[in-house]
C-alpha cells in the first residue's frame, strides 16, 4: 500500500493541488494531512494574492482521509491545545492583548501577530475545530501515529521545543506505534530519527529512498511554494520505505 502525507500548506492552494495530483498519479491509496492548513504570513510567504485557505480546506475534505490540527489551525479556529507543554493558557486567551499574552507565557509561544485573516466561512472554521491533534491509523499491517509535532508540544505551539530527542522517546512510550509521522519543521526532504540513525536527527533528501524500521520518527516536508523545500512524503507499507517527492513551483 502506498500512502501520501501532506503537511504545512499555509493556505497555498496551488501547491496543494499539485501535491494531490502527484499523490494520485503515483498511486497513493490513502492521503493524510499533518496540519498547518492555514497560517499565511507576509513575513514568511510571498503569494498573498493567491492564498486561499477555503480552497485548501475543501480540497482536503475531498481527498484526505484524516487531517491533523497544527498550531496555525488552532490559532485560526481559536482553539486551545489539549497538550499545553507546561504553558498555562487562561480561558480567555484569545481575548487578551498581544502584550498580555507575551507577559503570561514569557515569550515562549507563537502569537501569530503577522498572520493575515484567512477569510473562512463559519463552516470552514467549524471544520478546523473538529480536527484531531493526534490520530493512530492502521495501514498495511503497520500502526502509525500522526501528529503535527512531538509530545508534549503536540500542536507545535512553542517557539522553542523542549529537548526533541528526549521528547521523541517519550512520544514513543506514550503512543506505542510502529511509525510516527509529523510535520511542522519544513525540512528539505524529510527528517528521520530511530535506531538506524543512533537516535540522531538525520535529513533524507528529496528523491532518496529510506528503509524505515519499527519505532522510526519521520517529519514530512512542507507543501507550500519554496525554491527547495516543497513536497510530499510517500510511505510504501510493502517495502517499508519512504520517499519524498519534490514539487516544483
Identify the residue ranges that each predicted region occupies.
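Active-site environment of divalent metal-dependent phosphoester hydrolases
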Residues: 10-14, 39-41, 72-79, 152-153, ...
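His/acidic metal-ligating clusters that form di-metal
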Residues: 26-27, 114-194
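Conserved beta-sheet core of the metallophosphoesterase superfamily
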Residues: 161-241
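Active-site neighborhood of phospho(di)ester-bond hydrolases with catalytic His/Asp-centered motifs
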Residues: 6-7, 31-36, 66-71, 146-147, ...
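Core catalytic region of metal-dependent phosphoesterases/phosphodiesterases
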Residues: 6, 11-107, 111-112, 129
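Intrinsically disordered, low-complexity acidic Ser/Thr-rich regulatory segments
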Residues: 101-119, 210-216
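Beta-strand-turn-beta hairpins that frame and shape the catalytic cleft
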Residues: 1-4, 136-145, 211-218
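Short, solvent-exposed aromatic-acidic interface loops
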Residues: 244-249
